[in-house]
Each structure stands twice: as structure tokens, then as C-alpha cells.
């Protein structure tokens, strides 16, 4: 459950290290975002010579949450951190590598590129 002002780790090599959610996209009064949802973020920490800079406003897709994902069979998949992957204007990942596991819930949507780059899909 990601909401406005939530900090997330970045799970790709775009150059950002930490981002803050400034808007949950999809509806005028939408409060929370889960795995697979697109959010508007601002870069709070970045590495030198990265593709994105501190202060930039970008879109991102949530790939891991501490809250977890409830599956149809009743199982719950939780993670130790909240993480996102930075997206460009065409909703394609900015980075060329994904770090850490991602969930199968991304597969049903338009994020097959993230699924193919991820080292582990749960």
C-alpha cells in the first residue's frame, strides 16, 4: 500500500536510488497503490552520471510492497521493502536491469519487459 509521501527503493539501474510517491495515478481520489500500479514519483536520491537526476518527476510502477499481494489461492506474498521501477513517457522501463524479485501480477498487464529483465518472478 503506497500512498502520497511514501518512500520507495528503486529496483533498476536508471540511476535513482530512492523515490517519493507524489501521486497515485488512476482516479481523482485514489489513495493507495499496490503491486502493478503506476505512480508519479520524484527522485530523492540519485547516483552520479545516472539516466535520471535528483528532483526529476517520473512515472514508476510498484513491483514490491511490504503489504504484499493476495493470490486467488489464498497465499500471500510479502517483501521486505517497497520498490518501484522507473518508467518513461511510453511506460517502458528507463533502466536496462531489474534488481530483486518481482511478482507474476505484472505479467497480466503491460509490463512484460520488466518480467523478462527480472532475475526472479514469484
Swiss-Prot record:
Q: Which GO terms describe its biological process?
A: translation
Q: Which domain of life is it from?
A: Bacteria
One GO cellular component assignment for this chain's record is: cytosolic large ribosomal subunit
Q: List the disulfide bonds.
A: none
PROSITE patterns in UniProt: RIBOSOMAL_L14 (PS00049)
Q: Identify the Pfam families for this entry.
A: Ribosomal_L14
Whether RNA-binding counts among this entry's keywords is: yes
Q: Which UniProt keywords apply?
A: Ribonucleoprotein, Ribosomal protein, RNA-binding, rRNA-binding
Q: Tell me the GO molecular function terms.
A: large ribosomal subunit rRNA binding; structural constituent of ribosome
By its UniProt entry, which InterPro entries does this protein fall under? Ribosomal_uL14 (IPR000218), Ribosomal_uL14_bac-type (IPR005745), Ribosomal_uL14_CS (IPR019972), Ribosomal_uL14_sf (IPR036853)
UniProt subunit comment: Part of the 50S ribosomal subunit. Forms a cluster with proteins L3 and L19. In the 70S ribosome, L14 and L19 interact and together make contacts with the 16S rRNA in bridges B5 and B8.
Q: Which family does it belong to?
A: Belongs to the universal ribosomal protein uL14 family.
The family database entries (HAMAP family) matched by this protein are listed as:
Ribosomal_uL14 (MF_01367)
| Described purpose of this protein according to its UniProt entry | Binds to 23S rRNA. Forms part of two intersubunit bridges in the 70S ribosome.
Q: What is this protein called?
A: Large ribosomal subunit protein uL14
Amino acid at each position: 500500500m503506497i500512498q502520497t509521501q511514501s518512500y520507495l527503493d528503486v529496483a533498476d539501474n536508471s540511476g535513482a536510488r530512492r523515490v517519493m510517491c507524489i501521486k497515485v495515478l488512476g482516479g481523482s481520489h485514489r489513495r493507495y497503490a499496490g503491486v502493478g500500479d503506476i505512480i508519479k514519483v520524484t527522485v530523492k536520491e540519485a547516483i552520479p552520471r545516472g539516466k535520471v537526476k535528483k528532483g526529476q518527476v517520473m512515472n514508476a510502477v510498484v513491483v514490491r510492497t511490504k503489504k504484499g499481494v493476495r493470490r486467488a489461492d489464498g497465499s500471500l506474498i510479502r517483501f521486505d521493502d517497497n520498490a518501484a521501477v522507473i518508467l518513461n513517457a511510453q511506460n517502458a522501463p528507463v533502466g536496462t536491469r531489474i534488481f530483486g524479485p518481482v511478482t507474476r501480477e505484472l505479467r497480466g498487464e503491460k509490463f512484460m519487459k520488466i518480467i523478462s529483465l527480472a532475475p526472479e518472478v514469484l
